[in-house]
């Protein structure tokens, strides 16, 4: 049995030689730490020709950006590996491949995606991958349908829910999405110039009631095995290709949470684009984001509907029209969760480069206000936004 230790670069090389599945392991000679996240060490392993061949990822026992004063369970590495393995089973074309996992060392070996780019960085530059939103919709439909009650036998579903209980990581989500932004808290981070906007969140009783309902759904609706953190920084893209990574927040929760988080990150980019591009380029890129949102939802809903028609095993859930009614509830959830993503990324602990890297301070503050205003509106009126076209109309209204 392995005993946990924090990997050095040389440890990562030796581990990749043993478990990387490379025909000639001796060609692996160097590791470079590339992780910019808060929770893990990530090493790219290079061969003698300087080509990156494999990735080694190890969970740390604390939140990196805070330090050892915020400890974290190492079991999240098991949950991430098992979530990605399950998602790969149902959607291999859009899920990173896990070659090996060691629960004692909290380390996994996975495919290298050096020929891809992180989607967030591409979106900030104004680069458009026309197929990416449809591919993300396909990933969400395949992974969420095949881990839901529509497809799984009830006994299997209940056993999987137990396997994927992830209380410590869920608590982080519960705090950062549903608690911190609506109270004075030391984890919150925002410029003093928007204090009035943030104070308005804390005093908005209608908003806080709607957020409470969303948190309750996050607590209690074990609908499918979520990725749990499906933002544009956890997605790699290349021409015609897309892969999801980083699933340590995976657990059985409301389907609308994954869908809403994905849409929310596209809207965060929408809000930040005027701070990165000229007027015409920003306007064009914003239209691309709205197209992305429409294609993401339409692909997800259409594919989920087809899968439900063809593969639903439960007799009651096969009732004509039920899948459509279920998707209406998923949509309403998604709009609300989307709003919480917009707000928590603007005023909470974890921000996004789409807005934080805007050089002009006044423009950055304006983009933050835009995200907060849009997020508030979506949370409060989620049940009145009945279609993706209505969502896009609302986004235009608040822009």
From Swiss-Prot:
UniProt keyword terms in alphabetical order: Amino-acid biosynthesis, ATP-binding, Kinase, Methionine biosynthesis, Nucleotide-binding, Transferase
Pfam families per UniProt: APH (PF01636)
EC number: 2.7.1.100
Reaction catalysis annotation: 5-(methylsulfanyl)-D-ribose + ATP = 5-(methylsulfanyl)-alpha-D-ribose 1-phosphate + ADP + H(+)
GO terms (BP aspect): L-methionine salvage from methylthioadenosine
GO molecular function terms listed in the Swiss-Prot or TrEMBL record: ATP binding; S-methyl-5-thioribose kinase activity
Pathway: Amino-acid biosynthesis; L-methionine biosynthesis via salvage pathway; S-methyl-5-thio-alpha-D-ribose 1-phosphate from S-methyl-5'-thioadenosine (hydrolase route): step 2/2
InterPro entries for this protein: Aminoglycoside_PTrfase, Kinase-like_dom_sf, Methylthioribose_kinase
Disulfide pairings: none
Binding site for ATP: 40, 57, 111-113, 246-248
Record family assignment: Belongs to the methylthioribose kinase family.
SUBUNIT field: Homodimer.
Name of the molecule in the record: Methylthioribose kinase
UniProt source species: Citrobacter koseri (strain ATCC BAA-895 / CDC 4225-83 / SGSC4696)
């Amino acid at each position: 049995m392995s005993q946990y230790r924090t990997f050095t670069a040389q440890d990562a090389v030796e581990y990749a030689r043993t478990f990387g599945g490379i025909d000639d392991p001796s060609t692996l000679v160097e590791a470079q730490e590339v992780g910019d996240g808060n929770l893990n060490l990530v090493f790219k392993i290079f061969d003698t020709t300087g080509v990156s061949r494999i990735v080694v990822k190890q969970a740390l026992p604390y939140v990196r950006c805070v330090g050892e004063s915020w400890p974290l369970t190492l079991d999240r590495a098991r949950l991430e590996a098992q979530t990605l393995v399950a998602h790969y089973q149902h959607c291999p074309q859009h899920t990173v491949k896990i070659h090996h996992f060691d629960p004692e060392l909290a380390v996994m070996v996975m495919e290298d995606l050096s020929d891809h780019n992180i989607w967030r960085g591409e979106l900030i530059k104004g680069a458009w991958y026309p197929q990416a939103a449809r591919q993300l919709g396909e990933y969400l439909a395949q992974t969420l349908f095949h881990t839901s009650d529509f497809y799984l036998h009830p006994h299997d579903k209940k056993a999987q829910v137990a396997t994927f209980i992830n209380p410590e990581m869920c608590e982080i989500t519960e705090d950062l999405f549903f608690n911190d932004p609506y109270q004075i808290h030391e984890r919150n981070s925002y410029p003093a110039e928007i204090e009035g906007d943030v104070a308005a969140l804390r005093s908005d009783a209608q908003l806080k009631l709607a957020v409470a309902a969303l948190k309750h759904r996050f607590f209690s609706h074990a609908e499918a095995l979520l990725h749990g953190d499906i933002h544009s920084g956890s997605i790699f893209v290349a021409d015609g290709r897309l892969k999801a990574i980083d699933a340590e927040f995976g657990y059985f929760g409301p389907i609308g949470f994954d869908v809403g988080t994905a849409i929310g990150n596209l809207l965060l980019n929408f809000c930040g684009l005027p701070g990165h591009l000229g007027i015409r380029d920003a306007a064009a890129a914003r239209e691309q984001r709205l197209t992305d949102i429409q294609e993401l939802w339409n692909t997800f809903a259409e594919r989920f509907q087809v899968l439900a028609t063809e593969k639903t095993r439960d007799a009651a859930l096969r009732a004509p029209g039920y899948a459509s009614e279920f998707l209406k509830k998923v949509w309403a959830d998604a709009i609300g969760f989307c709003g919480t993503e917009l707000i928590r990324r603007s005023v909470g602990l974890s921000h996004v480069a789409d807005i934080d890297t805007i050089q002009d301070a006044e423009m950055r503050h304006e983009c933050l206000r835009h995200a907060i205003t849009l997020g508030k509106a979506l949370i409060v009126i989620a049940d009145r936004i009945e279609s993706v076209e209505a969502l896009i109309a609302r986004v235009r209204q608040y822009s």
